Amino acid sequence: MAAIRPPFTRETAQEKVKFAQNMWNTRNPEQVSKGYTADCVWRNRDAFFRGTNKIIEFLTEKWAKEKNYRLRKELFAFTDNKIAVQFWYEYQDSHDGMKWKRCYGLEDWTFDYETGKMKKRQMSANDIVLGRDGDGVAVPESGIEGRWYLDDVDVDDPSVTEKLTDAHF
């Protein structure tokens, strides 16, 4: 992620977003943490912290809870050294009977000009349970959403964005 440095163009901002998506989909906290400055400031929902060790600790706990995690990030907006993304991911919640859930949210990122690493990350998101009682199976006639990221679905498939729009707007 650090190889792409600000100031961003539409193309480089898009590359940064997809690189981050791919890194997060590895679910490797140590590898993911390399994209952030040593003193990076994070807000993730109601958690506020700073620094590489805290990032690794947070991500380790996150992915211990969020099993079968699959994430999609899309470029929302950008300026010189800032990028905003919308994202959604699905996972099975190991703290809630392995129910399938989908998280929807927005992030804003600020990058260091010299290193290209993220120096601030703020995330706000909400979760919904998928299927009846979290089984992940859609029941359209009842308005119950199911999983989008079935095992053979590419997270970058354009139909996922269409599903988001159709389901909620």
Where are these regions (language model features)?
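Short, low-complexity N-terminal intrinsically disordered segments enriched in polar/charged residues
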Residues: 1-38, 163-169
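Short helix-capping and hinge/turn segments at secondary-structure transitions, especially at repeat
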Residues: 25, 37, 41, 60-68
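Short solvent-exposed beta->alpha transition segments
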Residues: 41-62
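A beta-strand edge to alpha-helix "cap/lid" segment located at domain peripheries
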Residues: 3-8, 57-169
